[in-house]
UniProtKB/Swiss-Prot annotation:
This is Ribosomal RNA large subunit methyltransferase E. One of its GO terms (cellular component) is cytoplasm. The active site is at 183 (proton acceptor). Belongs to the class I-like SAM-binding methyltransferase superfamily. RNA methyltransferase RlmE family. The keyword Transport does not apply. GO terms for molecular function: rRNA (uridine-2'-O-)-methyltransferase activity. It comes from Rickettsia typhi (strain ATCC VR-144 / Wilmington). Its EC number is 2.1.1.166. It catalyses: uridine(2552) in 23S rRNA + S-adenosyl-L-methionine = 2'-O-methyluridine(2552) in 23S rRNA + S-adenosyl-L-homocysteine + H(+).
Length: 227
């Protein structure tokens, strides 16, 4: 995987603020139109720029191998599930090589991916995931984030709570010596969660992919080898 973006950087596109469009929406649209990773994802067939973040995480930590069972939390629009499907060489008829993806929003089919259009926090979701796995998972990955409101402390806490829920779920479904990755936003309140994770995994790292926007406080928690 390369982060060479030559050929994907376009002239700056300027967006006029429509009378009924909030300034924040115009800023988001401008950022999307001028983001080389958005252009690269479109040309290379990935559903989101987040695919490159997972590719970078894999390049650094070598998480994916054939014959894995993976849970993808907050999967829409499917960029991470796409990457995982390619890296484990998933197929629809190999039950030992599968991905269970969950999101409230629908995603289009991906080879080797069983999609549950569910709220992760509903009582029966966990049971459905475990049934779909038909055993324990080799990797739980979460790119879940709360809807941001522009208040960094609030956004930090909300996404941290999602990460904590994903971590508690991972402890239930992961095999020993297997892995957990999740998005968090830096903000100071993550220390308690990190200490919990360190008690349950042999190696815990922070990683900020190059493809993560420089102005974003997001980083990825990479927890390796569950005890």
């Amino acid at each position: 995987m390369t982060n060479n973006l030559s050929g994907y950087r376009n002239k700056i596109v300027r967006v006029k603020t429509a009378k009924k469009r909030p300034i924040s929406s115009s800023n988001w649209l401008r950022r999307q139109l001028n983001d080389p990773y958005v252009a690269k994802a479109r040309l290379e067939g990935f559903r989101s720029r987040a695919a490159y973040k997972l590719l970078e995480i894999h390049d650094k930590f070598r998480l994916f191998t054939p014959n894995m069972k993976i849970v993808d939390l907050g999967a829409a629009p499917g960029g991470w599930s796409q990457v995982a499907s390619k890296l484990i060489k998933a197929s629809d008829n190999n039950l030992n090589n599968k991905i269970i993806s969950i999101d409230l929003l629908k995603i289009e089919p991906i080879v080797g991916v069983e999609f549950l259009q569910k709220d992760f926090f509903e009582k029966d979701t966990e049971e459905l995931i475990i049934h779909g796995l038909d055993g324990k998972a080799d990797l739980v990955m979460s790119d879940m984030a709360s809807n941001t409101i522009g208040h960094k402390a609030t956004d930090h806490i909300r996404t941290l709570l999602l990460c904590e829920q994903a971590f508690e779920f991972a402890l239930k479904v992961l095999k020993p010596s297997c892995h957990f990755i999740a998005k968090i936003f830096r903000g100071g309140a993550e220390t308690a969660l990190l200490n919990k994770v360190k008690r349950e995994f042999r190696t815990v790292k922070h990683f900020k992919p190059v493809s993560s926007r420089s102005e974003s406080t997001e980083i990825y928690l990479v927890a390796l080898n569950k005890k």
